[in-house]
From Swiss-Prot:
PANTHER family: CLEAVAGE/POLYADENYLATION FACTOR IA SUBUNIT CLP1P, POLYRIBONUCLEOTIDE 5'-HYDROXYL-KINASE CLP1. Component of a pre-mRNA cleavage factor complex. Interacts directly with PCF11. The gene is CLP1. It is found in: Nucleus. ATP binds at E34, K73, H157, S158, G159, K160, T161, S162. GO terms for cellular component: mRNA cleavage factor complex. Keywords: ATP-binding, mRNA processing, Nucleotide-binding, Nucleus. GO terms for biological process: mRNA 3'-end processing; tRNA splicing, via endonucleolytic cleavage and ligation. This is mRNA cleavage and polyadenylation factor CLP1. One of its GO terms (molecular function) is ATP binding.
């Protein structure tokens, strides 16, 4: 039984048995205080709440149930006056014992200064909004309204994702199903890094998974209630690598999200929660597009008075017509400034989890060899490289395609595709080795550039090796089965098993 995936056979496989001799520690957290801790990837913290109520980003921890955390920067908040008691001990994580240069020791402290009261007040305001919308829609089926559409913005390391996760968790506790929209391609939210997702949240997050999100149906069965994200492929981990493609994918994701809200009354009443990459007033065009595409009516600014004032000036016409409200909340004192090494390691673990599952819900990834000639493969265009090439043109010149290269009806569409994707005419190890490839929903006999731009993602595959001699590629899939002969899009996200 222990060898069967899903029955806990691999739960402790990455634990160094010698480390189990470590004595457990007890932490007493006072009411409205939080215990902040950082666990390196080389260490596994095993903790449980033995008394009271404790929650991580709004997700309540089960009483007397041990959970395992690694590579996290979390805080356990005690919402009740009685506080809570936590027991924990640490063991070595054999899977990451040599993969990082970080220390094995955790860092932890208790803080009585927390921004959770502000975040809870924001939640109560949103819930009051949802309640009024629900009552209106119940008696007015012909003129229904939509719940709060919340956009969270702020600088880097301001706690945007933590706030969105907290608001989504609190919404679930009130039996709501808000759509969580992730527009930060750096993070893999129910998908791999480089993707933009929209996911209805109707169940608690899986705190033991990478970044505390949980699994989805895109890679297999899950321990928790599976999330079903709508995934748009962007292909880069920075929104600035191809702004045209980023804005286009945001617009199409917005169309799909608005359509979903019109079809599902529970989602319509619950509204949206939108997480974003670090944005400043210089990125106003992006913010303006998001507000328009997702019909945002509330913008939450975290800890940046200047950004709040500048945005109010830019959106004064919407404020005057009561189409948009602004809310400023303080930045949490527990926000950690993560370095690039931690971000990359977190991305690698996210990709690894996508294909291999978690310790509680392991997957059986499927390896196969495919003939590259049987597939049509595109690659996302890095606009920074394109701009570098155009810089060699003489001053005042610009590149335009030859008129003979395309028909009149297709000129505009075909040339517009070059801004976003380029077809790999000769796939090779130099452009496919150790890369993540998006499997689109578009059959490869479809030659429409517009359909390619509008398609969503079925899932992702990992090309571990490309044989230039045989023109074959070794591919890893998250579950057994034949790879559909759909158009593939190679991303800039690399991964080595």
């Amino acid at each position: 039984m222990s060898a069967i995936p899903g029955f806990g056979g691999d739960l402790n496989s990455n634990i160094d048995e010698d480390s189990n001799l470590n004595k457990s520690s007890v932490v007493e957290i006072n009411g409205q205080s939080e215990w902040r801790f950082e666990v390196p990837f080389r260490t596994i913290m095993k903790l449980k709440v033995v008394n009271g109520i404790g929650e991580i980003f709004g997700t309540e921890l089960p009483l007397n149930v041990e959970i395992s955390l690694t590579g996290v920067k979390y805080a356990i908040y005690a919402p009740l006056d009685e506080g809570c008691k936590v027991e924990y001990y640490c063991v070595s994580n054999k899977a990451n014992s040599t993969s990082t240069n970080e220390d094995d020791e955790i860092s932890e402290y208790i803080s009585e200064e927390t921004s959770m009261n502000h975040y809870m007040n924001l939640h109560f305001a949103l819930e009051s909004y949802r309640q009024s919308i629900s009552e209106h829609n119940f008696v007015n089926s012909s003129s229904q309204k939509t719940g709060p559409r919340v956009l969270v913005v702020g600088n880097r390391h301001s706690g945007k994702t933590s706030l969105v996760k907290t608001l989504a968790s609190y919404g679930c506790k009130m039996d709501r199903s808000p759509i969580l929209v992730n527009l930060n391609p750096r993070d893999g939210v129910f998908s791999v890094p480089g993707s933009l997702t929209a996911t209805p949240i109707s169940d608690a997050f899986d705190l033991e998974s990478v970044n505390g999100w949980g699994g989805s149906t895109t890679s297999g069965s899950t321990f928790h209630n599976p999330k079903q994200p709508l995934v748009k492929n962007y292909g880069f981990t920075s929104h600035s690598d191809n702004l045209d493609l980023y804005k286009y994918q945001i617009s199409k994701l917005g169309v799909a999200v608005v359509s979903r809200m019109e079809e599902d009354i529970a989602v319509k009443n619950s509204g949206l929660l939108i997480d974003t990459p670090p944005l400043s007033i210089k990125d106003f065009t992006i913010i303006e597009n998001i507000v328009s595409d997702f019909e945002v009516n509330i913008i939450v600014v975290i800890g940046n008075e200047r950004l709040l004032i500048d945005l109010k000036k830019k959106f004064k016409h919407k404020i005057a017509s009561s189409q948009l409200d602004f809310v400023k909340v303080p930045k949490s004192g527990g926000v950690i400034e993560v370095d690039d090494a931690y971000i990359r390691k977190s991305q690698e673990e996210s990709i690894k989890e996508y294909f291999n599952g978690t310790i509680r819900s392991p997957l059986s990834p499927f390896k196969t060899e495919l003939d590259a000639k049987d597939f049509v493969i595109y690659k996302c265009v890095d606009s920074s490289e394109a701009n570098s090439n155009l810089s060699f043109l003489p001053s005042g010149d610009s590149f335009t395609p030859e008129a003979s290269e395309m028909s009149d009806g297709d000129k505009k569409e075909e040339f517009s595709l070059d801004t976003y994707y380029s077809q790999l005419q000769e796939p090779s190890s130099s452009n496919l080795d150790n890369s993540i490839v998006a499997i689109t929903q578009l059959p490869q006999n479809n030659k429409s550039a517009r359909d390619l731009m509008n398609t969503c993602v079925l899932g992702y595959a990992h090309v571990s090796k490309f044989d230039d001699t045989k023109s074959k590629m070794k591919v890893l899939l998250p579950f057994p089965g034949a790879l559909p002969r759909n158009i593939l899009i190679s991303t800039s996200v690399g991964y080595t098993e």
